[in-house]
Amino acid sequence: MEGLTYKYYKKNNSKNIYLIIHGGGPVGVETDFISAIFDTIAKTHNSALCFNFPYCERREESSSGPDLLEEVSTLKQVIDFIHTEGYNRITIIAKSLGGIISGYYFAKYPDKSIDLIILGYIPNEVKQNAISDNLKLVIQGENDRFAAPSEVHKIVGNKVAVIEIKNADHSYQNHNKEPIYQNEVLDHLVNWI
């Protein structure tokens, strides 16, 4: 975890941790939505951890490149840290780019013991074959520019729950770019936990 900006809520005696992976852009864990996910998970009496990828620390808009080498290496470092903390169950909650990075991670480091939730699935970018044993839930906006929930369901199959957020875009905002559907996403996460 050296060199990373992160938030870590360690619930005493908890064997479950939720690892929250932010989406694209230079803000990372400081976005209101990622912070709200972190706070919501902490209220469920589970441990939670979220961190910035190095490109955020450099205030860059984009990830390290098409193979996401730096991001996969960083995610491995974080998951290794989580294992040393003694957790029995790891669930990744990945927003958008975080889902893509998770796919690259599982392609390189398969681990069926880690569950994956994707908030805003991006077809043709997510390595579905690499995450097929991990993916449990997708929460997708009805008006997501990358794929409608029905398209996502066709890709991920019947073993994965796909929840549609009516009228929401990829960031769970309305047509005026107001994030009015993000609380609905948080409610679905809590119900799933």
Predicted segment positions?
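Acidic beta-to-alpha connecting loop that harbors the catalytic carboxylate
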Residues: 142-145, 166-169
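Short beta-strand/loop motif that positions the catalytic acidic residue
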Residues: 132, 137-140, 144
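Primarily recognizes the serine-hydrolase "nucleophile elbow" in alpha/beta-hydrolase
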Residues: 78-134
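Alpha/beta-hydrolase
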Residues: 21-24, 119, 165
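Serine-hydrolase catalytic machinery in alpha/beta-hydrolase-like enzymes
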Residues: 2-85
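Catalytic histidine-centered segment of alpha/beta-hydrolase-like enzymes
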Residues: 168-182
